[in-house]
């Protein structure tokens, strides 16, 4: 199997490379990653032909999304597919944040929010951090303990945005 061959995701019309690049490590998952190292890694992925990138607000409280914004500047927007996630809102705070999973976090309170307004705000905030005018795929992040609200509010909100 060629990891750089493209495959369509269902009947969406979106074609992604079989190998994608996930952004959790760039948010400081288990190890702090400097922006230069993250952007160089993403650029190396682009250089070898990777055209599917996944990130989330949760990954480093927005750091991963900002690093993708920096690394993908100048890359033809229609040449890649980018996914992010909803379900967490990032609210600035004066206090430094600590986390058992992500290191060196910016001062943000991370709040679960699967409401319609929360979904819309999450997408708008991600677009700003990513410096993009569109997100190709939006996943609901960790819906397990919020099943009813996800079904009643998050999914209908995402369906509106199709």
Predicted segments with their positions:
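Glycine/proline-rich, positively charged
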Residues: 30, 98-162
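N-terminal binding-site loop/beta-alpha segment at the start of enzyme catalytic domains
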Residues: 1-92
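Short acidic, glycine/serine/threonine-rich loops at helix termini
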Residues: 94-96
């Amino acid at each position: 199997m060629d990891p750089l061959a493209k495959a369509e995701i269902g009947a969406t019309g979106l074609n992604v490379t079989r190998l994608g690049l996930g952004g959790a490590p760039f948010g400081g998952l288990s190890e702090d990653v400097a922006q230069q190292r993250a952007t160089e890694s993403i650029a190396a992925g682009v250089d070898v032909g990777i055209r599917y990138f996944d990130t989330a607000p949760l990954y480093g409280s927005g750091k991963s999304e900002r690093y993708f914004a920096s690394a993908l500047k100048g890359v033809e927007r229609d040449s890649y597919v980018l996914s992010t996630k909803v379900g967490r809102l990032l609210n600035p705070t004066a206090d430094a944040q600590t986390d058992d999973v992500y290191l060196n976090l910016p001062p943000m309170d991370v709040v679960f929010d699967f409401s319609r307004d929360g979904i819309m705000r999450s997408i708008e905030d991600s677009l700003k951090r990513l410096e993009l005018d569109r997100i190709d795929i939006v996943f609901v992040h960790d819906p397990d303990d919020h099943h009813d609200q996800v079904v009643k509010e998050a999914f209908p909100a995402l369906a509106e945005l199709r």
